[in-house]
Every structure is written in structure tokens, then in C-alpha cells.
Regions:
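Positively charged, structured surface patches that bind polyanionic biopolymers
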Residues: 1-91, 96-99, 103-104
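Basic DNA-binding region of bZIP-type proteins
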Residues: 101-125
Length: 126
């Protein structure tokens, strides 16, 4: 099961408090939004956190935010420092810090499975 690190400081981190303030919500709500963002990111983002080709409306939809408020929620995530705007969409800021162990684990498993397949194939050819 995929996972990401949820640090104990997230709930009261200045970035989280800023996000809550910008969206006129309490910090617990902001933490929930961030958990949605990060859990969705496990499937939607690349290893570097890149949400390539996705618009603000796409991000808002993934977070179950009303389409007419897409710019508000994504703008707040950018202003708070959780998303970075790129020329081709968005990047989840410091994504590798949150999900890096998952990507490393997936890579090790791929390599291990490939070695197993190679050994099996070599035995079959003997």
C-alpha cells in the first residue's frame, strides 16, 4: 500500500497555518486538504512531484474542490508553498521529502524482480 510521510509538525507548520488563513478554514481542515493532495500525488505526480500538464481545475477536481474556486485553492497552495507553478503545470513542493522512500522502495523492488526474472530465464536456457 502506498504511503507518504506525515510529519508531526505539519498541523502547526507556518505553511499550513498560512494555507488555512488564505482559505478561511481552520488548520485541521488544511491538514486534511494536504493529506488529500499528498495521497493523490502518489498516483498523479512523478518522482520529483511534477503534475505535468495539469491545470488548476484538474488539481481542484482531484481535491474535490468546486471548479469555480479552482484558482482560489491552487493559488493558496502555491502562496503557502505546497505547490510550485511551472511552465507545464504544477509541482508538489519538496515532494521527494514526503514520498521519496516509496519511490526508492518501488525502484528496489523493480530491480529485485528484474534480477529474479533474469536468473529464471538463464536457468531455462541451460
Amino acid at each position: 500500500m502506498p504511503w507518504f510521510e506525515a510529519h508531526d509538525t505539519m498541523a502547526r507548520h507556518p505553511k499550513t497555518l498560512k494555507l488555512a488563513r488564505l482559505l478561511n478554514q481552520d488548520r485541521r481542515w488544511a491538514v486534511g486538504l494536504l493529506h488529500d493532495l499528498f495521497s493523490w500525488g502518489l498516483y498523479a505526480a512523478g518522482k520529483d512531484g511534477e503534475l505535468k500538464g495539469l491545470t488548476a481545475a484538474d488539481v481542484a477536481q482531484a481535491l474535490d474542490y468546486p471548479p469555480k474556486k479552482a484558482q482560489v485553492v491552487v493559488g493558496a497552495l502555491v502562496a503557502a508553498g505546497y505547490l510550485d507553478e511551472t511552465s507545464d503545470g504544477y509541482t508538489i513542493h519538496d515532494w521527494y521529502d514526503y514520498a521519496g522512500k516509496l519511490y526508492d522502495s518501488r525502484e528496489k523492488n523493480r530491480e529485485k524482480n528484474q534480477r529474479y526474472r533474469d536468473r529464471k530465464r538463464a536457468k531455462e536456457c541451460q
